[in-house]
Amino acid sequence: MRIVFAGTGEFAVPILKTIASQTDWDITLVVSEPAKPAGRRQKLTDSAVAQAAQELNLKTATPAAIQDIKSDLAALNPEVMVVVAYGQILPLEVINISKFGTVNVHPSLLPKLRGASPIQAALTQGLTETGVSLMLIDEKVDHGPVISHEALAIGDGDTYLILEPKLAELGAQMIIRDLAKYVSGE
């Protein structure tokens, strides 16, 4: 399966690595946000996903806006685009480039906790569970048909730093289990 992967933050790294480990899946391009100043000296630093893609020897693009590489994406003829913590809202012409659409891995049980900070929202609201949803992206933020979702209990002592890697690992398991089923029509 030919896949374009778009992601930026740490949450996306385990999912990228899991997809890259599948011998019958081919990541044709990893798209991430451009390097940004970080640290005391404000040194330009690649995103966590761009760094992981380089370690995996995957072709990477870091456009200021994803629509700037729309024709390059179309030329790759991806079967599916997977988006995880990318940080940009995708225009419809990018969403519809791949044969089976664009699948988002979102760290909440949609439609609850839409938006850019669902893990923090689950913790500040005192929820006892959250989860991960795989959904087809449409023109609205974190909106579209849910392919699958799975709950995860939030422990009494869980913080963002504890919960994020648990949810990322769950998302990685789900993408392997559910993406192929979705593409094959199961």
Predicted feature residues:
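N-terminal Rossmann-like dinucleotide-binding module
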Residues: 1-40
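Catalytic cores of RNA-modifying enzymes
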Residues: 1, 53-56, 73-80
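Short, structured coil segments at secondary-structure junctions
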Residues: 23, 56, 97-98
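Short amphipathic alpha-helix with an adjacent loop that forms part of the alpha/beta core around
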Residues: 67-77, 96
